């Protein structure tokens, strides 16, 4: 096994789709259930803006909320017990022109912060999961791009 970072974990991928399409995918709570290994088969929970899914690891039901920031191309994921969701995961999309990429591509970075008290084994599993999840996101976004190339995506402004 590799050494696991103690405080945070970050993974980045090149996505062959526009930043807007990638952001739209990440901001859709129902799509989280297609790539987040701890929240598969996502569905709305019993409170507005809160969703639940099942962990592929142990079948436990997990809750999450999605807070998109369109102007920043940033999506914040709050996770934890339904009544105590905490923002611990972020997905940041970087536009092609910011880093000299081809126009129809972008970078995606997933970042997770380790809470104090999270056991090393669980943190290691989370880090390994993110290394897989970024591939799931990449493939699903790129497959959507192939099905609907040049789809114009207009982002809504950040909620006030």
Where are these regions (language model features)?
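Hydrophobic ligand-binding cavity/cleft-lining segments
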Residues: 1-47, 160
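Generic structural detector for well-ordered beta-strands
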Residues: 12-16, 65, 92
